[in-house]
Amino acid sequence: MENTPFIHIENLSYSYVGENEQPIPVLKDLSLNIREGEYVVILGHNGSGKSTFAKLLNLVIDDYTFAEGRIIVNGFDVMSPDLTDEDILELRRSVGMVFQNPDNQLVATMVEEDVAFGPENLGVPQPELRQRVDEALATVGMTEYAHHEPHRLSGGQKQRVAIAGIIAMKPRCMIFDESTAMLDPVGRKEVLETIEKLNREEGITVISITHYMDEAARADRVIVLSDGKLMLDGSPGEVFTHSDTLRKAGLDLPQCTAVSHYLITHGIPVCGEINTPEQCAEAILNAWKKV
């Protein structure tokens, strides 16, 4: 059905097994839907449950001993004991995941071989495999590095190669779990531009787990988790109006949004949402003209 969400989470609770086999709650009665083609950022402090949530979506975590509720992804009931090996393979193909440290995802001695690793294991034949690798490298702007050794690349370049490896498997959704956390500003910019391109131009559903508020400002939708519970859910502009709730969740406003709040509280008129540097600069310029 056209209106069926790509991801449906219903009353999801999940616990890790702690000392003495006692469950430690991580997610608590979480319910939400994510539509295909959305760009969603999930925010939360350390221990909020955001990374656990992401890893449940494509079976990186597959022990549901202390789990309740439902996780439906691309039509598959992820927690069902009736999932076949073919179902699991299709689920992991349709939902790719990029982790914090790109070195943990790079397995080959040449960039193009690394990108080919995933689809090759899926049984993609030549010449389609060659075409997928070339297209994936072009998408992330790494074609000229096809014959380079991955370990000689910068952090941002390595992460783009890791992303290309997922793209080559033709996913419908990509999850980025703190994928910019270990990068310098240049590397972060490269990866964020790649993520936006995948969503805007390729139509890939993007779920980005982060604690960087400026990254959240780029998304269509922001979800805030705190202590395993859903605290806020809306557009960046809607979520950032709840500054007190964000602070209680251990989060700050994006710098540009904080600047706009400062201007308003000091009697300087500012119109519209201000979540990005471009919006901030334009608002300050317009306000200056009115002074």
Language model features: what each stretch is:
Residues 70-90:
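ABC ATPase NBD Q-loop/coupling interface
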Residues 43-48:
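The feature captures the beta-strand-to-loop junction immediately N-terminal to the Walker
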Residues 174-177:
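Catalytic Walker B motif of ABC-type/P-loop ATPase nucleotide-binding domains
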Residues 149-153, 157:
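Conserved ABC ATPase signature
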Residues 2-6, 15-29, 61-64, 81-87, ...:
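A short, flexible loop at the N-terminus of ABC-type nucleotide-binding domains that lies
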Residues 76-77, 127-145:
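Conserved ABC ATPase "signature" region
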